[in-house]
Swiss-Prot record:
Residues 66-99 form a propeptide. This is Beta-defensin 127. Has antibacterial activity. Its main location: secreted. It comes from Pan troglodytes.
Amino acid sequence: MGLFMIIAILLFQKPTVTEQLKKCWNNYVQGHCRKICRVNEVPEALCENGRYCCLNIKELEACKKITKPSHPKPATLALTLQDYVTIIENFPSLKTQST
């Protein structure tokens, strides 16, 4: 009867924090902390426990395609006629430099 109680207690115990598979990375791509990453996973960073944060390659590529920002168009400089007049007025003429 004592052996049955010991086995029952061991079966119903929850695993400790180190035995559980920890989640890592960010909100968009979830990874798992492992000593060795699987074939379809890539190590991106270190977890708190010194293991690798293994991310699924397909999920990572899909996230990069979605979150890739579009390049902004370069700003164009448009000068008005008044801008040209002020530039010409402030530019020293050749006659004043030669005398």
